[in-house]
Each structure stands twice: as C-alpha cells, then as structure tokens.
Amino acid sequence: MSGPGGVGKSTIVDALIERDANLWLSRSWTTRERRQGEKQDAYKFVTREQFEQHISDGGFLEWTDFLGNLYGTPTPSAPSGKDTVLEIEVDGAQQVKRLNHQALLIFVLPPSRQEQKSRLHGRGDSDQKVEKRLQKAEDEEPVGKAIADYVLINDDLASTVDEMSRIIDYERKQRNS
C-alpha cells in the first residue's frame, strides 16, 4: 500500500492486520524521529548510520530519501502461508513494482487536500513540514495512480478497510485459481 502522508496508511494497515490473520506487515525502517503519540512499533526507528549499514549489507527490498529522512523496507521474510503487506512511499512502490511485476499495489488518497492538511496537523507536523508533504503529494499522485492496481479514497476508515479486504480476497482467489 502506498499513498501520500496523512491518508491513513498506518491506521488502515493496522486494521487489515487485525482483521486478516493471513497478512503479515513488513515493518519499515526510518531515520526520522518518532512523532509524539506515535506507537513505538510504527517503524523500526534507527540512526542514519544503522540505516546506511543495512543498505550496504543489501538488507532492503527498497529504500528512499523522503524529505531528508531515510525510509526502507527490509527484505521481507514472512511466515509461511502469510501474504506480506508493505506500507511504502511512492518511490518505494515503483522500486517494488520493477522488482516484482505481480506485486499488488493499492494507492490510497485523501478525500481532499484540506482533509489531508488537517490530518497532518493533527499528528503534530509543523506548518513547514505540512506544506512540503502537500507539495510532495501533488507530485506523487499522478505517479501513484499510474502504477497502482487499485486507487482508493480514504474518506471513511471502515469503508476503506472493507474495500481493501475485498480487493485482497479477490486477488488471492485470482492468484490461486
């Protein structure tokens, strides 16, 4: 799953993982500071040096520099029988799609830029950071839509999670038929 900041990716993923025992989240690494109130396990928070060493060791499926912080998905090692969920930026989604054309990409958008702005402020982002994220979202949206298998607008969490569950179930049936 990919989408700009403030669309609710983490909240959606948490709900999906709780609902579907056959999903496994590959926890992303980041060098950014943990936000106030953010769960300890939202990411694996590491230093830039640790992150760069992991890059050197070939330990990431994909990684990107996003607004001065590094984000990366460690090479997944899902338990047997589980489908891996990646919660990644658009740059990372492009890398994953290049590596695995069969990877399913669901791109999530906010109902409006105003709502996105409100969500970003609500999680404690500064005005400057919010403006950077909104500009980045404008730039990423056409790319995300172009590479996505599905595009969803998260205007209601329960509906979005239900729709994602239906998509995952449908894709599993297609894969197994």
Give residue spans per PLM region:
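ATP-binding Walker
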Residues: G6-V7
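The feature captures the helix immediately C-terminal to the Walker
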Residues: V13-D14
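Post-Walker A helix-loop "phosphate-sensing" segment adjacent to the P-loop in P-loop NTPases
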Residues: I17-S26
